[in-house]
């Protein structure tokens, strides 16, 4: 149920990142935005102007009459706004002093500092968007590739919401038939028809949930990035690989073994797949205390990574350290990179292929940029069988909360099928069907708890 705007006070926050810039935006939302602005803005009478218009003027300190900044003020009237409330946005010169001064004046003359995510929370509570769309706002802000941005936009447009609501409607139609059976128990054929319909509907909805969950692995990668550990013994080209993928020098590249003492993390877009690259310290036996800590962190990175890129030096024979790493990573999703192929080959390729298993083997010379296109294509196809474009028009589930609720809803439908198979009365089976309906409703926010909203929106930034 939507909450009316009269239940909300007027809030204000800075919507642009802190620091110096071209402009800053202070956003106000609520019933009294015009009263607050009228006390500060010298220019047009904002109470008389039309919606979605921009007006030039100045912000003055009402107490001293001093001019604070030259501004442009945008007026947006309810309900056609982000929050479905009256909104005023003050565009001032970028910078910490002027921006904070204007915000403080807004707070001094009737507004309250917004909580993190409160604008989006109001958009949800006022019925402009559902919970899935609200969560997609943060996904859009955090998107690291064009594809992850597209998925977030699709969810913001309601693609996932529409699919979930269709599933809920299918369940609701089935529940209505159950009510007929309960109201007319004297007709035996009604119960038979109802249980048959419930079985078919439970199977049908479960299959659609299964199809949606099949996108979860790819969706999670797009939303959170692929945790990718670059591992290998010292001085095989790990940092060079990191720098090449980043197209900049983030890691130190030298001929000295053990130069990378810590774990370096960076995000990079590889063929539309967001990678969270983890350049680890070279793994070897060492007496250096600092390097030892880095080596231990490298081992942990291997265990938690979604993808391991194991770099071997093709210009040297396989060492005991190489063999140990091949063993340590054999149960991971990995790519073997045979680097320095521009030098005379010393590595026993047959021996490497024998222990590689299903792991792709890519021959590279990072120094000469050979083999890198093949590496990037391999990464993309490991997680998107036909490439990132193959999922272009697919509704995807990317959020761990949604994935968990879909699994729970599927389990509830299992209980429906098992209950009917066991000969349970229809009114008892109805309980599990209703549970599946409620669980799907938690995805879109058609049913929710206040604690959930507080947790979700606290992850947003101020001003959004």
Curated annotation (Swiss-Prot):
Protein residues bound to K(+): 235, 254, 256, 259
E.C. number: 3.6.-.-
Binding, Mg(2+): 239, 260
Pfam families in alphabetical order: MMR_HSR1, MnmE_helical, TrmE_N
UniProt-listed GO biological process terms: tRNA methylation; tRNA wobble uridine modification
Entry's cofactor comment: Binds 1 potassium ion per subunit.
Enzyme class: hydrolase
GO-annotated molecular function: GTP binding; GTPase activity; metal ion binding
Main subcellular location of this protein, as a coarse class: cytoplasm
GO cellular component: cytosol
Domain named TrmE-type G: residues: 225-384
Keywords: Cytoplasm, GTP-binding, Hydrolase, Magnesium, Metal-binding, Nucleotide-binding, Potassium, tRNA processing
Location(s) in or outside the cell: Cytoplasm
Binding residues for (6S)-5-formyl-5,6,7,8-tetrahydrofolate: 27, 89, 128, 464
Cofactor requirements of the protein: K(+)
Binding residues annotated for GTP, in chain numbering: 235-240, 254-260, 279-282
Quaternary structure note: Homodimer. Heterotetramer of two MnmE and two MnmG subunits.
Record HAMAP family: GTPase_MnmE
Function: Exhibits a very high intrinsic GTPase hydrolysis rate. Involved in the addition of a carboxymethylaminomethyl (cmnm) group at the wobble position (U34) of certain tRNAs, forming tRNA-cmnm(5)s(2)U34.
Record family assignment: Belongs to the TRAFAC class TrmE-Era-EngA-EngB-Septin-like GTPase superfamily. TrmE GTPase family.
Listed name of the protein: tRNA modification GTPase MnmE
Species whose genome carries this gene: Levilactobacillus brevis (strain ATCC 367 / BCRC 12310 / CIP 105137 / JCM 1170 / LMG 11437 / NCIMB 947 / NCTC 947)
Lineage of producing organism: Bacteria, Bacillati, Bacillota, Bacilli, Lactobacillales
């Amino acid at each position: 149920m939507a909450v009316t705007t009269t239940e909300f006070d007027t809030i204000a926050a800075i919507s642009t990142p802190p620091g110096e810039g071209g402009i800053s935006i202070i956003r106000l939302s609520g019933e009294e935005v015009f009263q607050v602005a009228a006390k500060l803005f010298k220019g047009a009478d904002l109470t008389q102007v039309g919606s979605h218009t921009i007006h030039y003027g100045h912000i003055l300190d009402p107490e001293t009459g001093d001019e604070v900044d030259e501004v442009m003020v945008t007026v947006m009237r309810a309900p056609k706004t982000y929050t479905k409330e009256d909104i005023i946005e003050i565009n001032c010169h970028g910078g910490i002093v002027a921006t904070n001064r204007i915000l403080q004046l807004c707070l001094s003359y009737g507004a309250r500092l917004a909580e993190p995510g409160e604008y989006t929370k109001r958009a949800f509570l006022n019925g402009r968007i559902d919970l899935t769309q609200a969560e997609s706002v943060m996904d859009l802000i955090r998107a690291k590739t064009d594809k992850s941005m597209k998925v977030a936009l699709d969810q913001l447009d309601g693609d996932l919401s529409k699919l979930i609501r269709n599933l809920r409607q299918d369940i609701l139609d089935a529940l209505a038939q159950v009510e007929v059976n309960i109201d007319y128990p004297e007709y035996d054929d009604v119960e038979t028809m109802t249980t048959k319909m419930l079985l078919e509907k439970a199977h049908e909805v479960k299959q659609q949930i299964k199809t949606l969950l099949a996108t979860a692995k790819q969706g999670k990668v797009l939303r959170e990035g692929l945790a990718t550990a670059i591992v290998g013994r010292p001085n095989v080209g790990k940092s060079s690989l990191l720098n090449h993928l980043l197209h900049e020098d983030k890691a130190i590249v030298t001929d000295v073994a053990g130069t990378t003492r810590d774990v370096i993390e960076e995000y990079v877009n590889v063929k539309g797949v967001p990678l969270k690259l983890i350049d680890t310290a070279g793994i070897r036996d060492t007496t250096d205390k600092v390097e030892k800590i880095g080596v231990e962190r490298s081992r942990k990175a291997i265990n938690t990574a979604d993808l391991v890129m194991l770099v071997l030096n093709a210009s040297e024979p396989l060492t005991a350290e190489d063999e140990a790493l091949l063993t340590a990573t054999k149960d991971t999703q990995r790519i073997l990179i045979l680097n320095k192929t521009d030098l005379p080959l010393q590595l026993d390729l047959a021996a490497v292929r024998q222990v590689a298993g299903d792991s792709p083997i890519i021959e590279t010379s990072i120094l000469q940029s050979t083999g890198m296109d093949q590496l990037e294509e391999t990464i993309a196809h490991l997680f998107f069988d036909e490439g990132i474009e193959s999922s272009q028009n697919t509704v995807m589930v990317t959020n761990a909360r949604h994935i968990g609720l879909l699994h729970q809803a599927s389990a509830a439908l299992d209980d429906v099928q098992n209950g009917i198979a066991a000969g349970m009365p229809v009114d008892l089976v109805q309980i599990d069907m209703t549970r599946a309906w409620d669980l799907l409703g938690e995805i879109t926010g058609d049913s929710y708890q206040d604690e959930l909203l507080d947790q979700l929106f606290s992850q947003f930034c101020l001003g959004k």
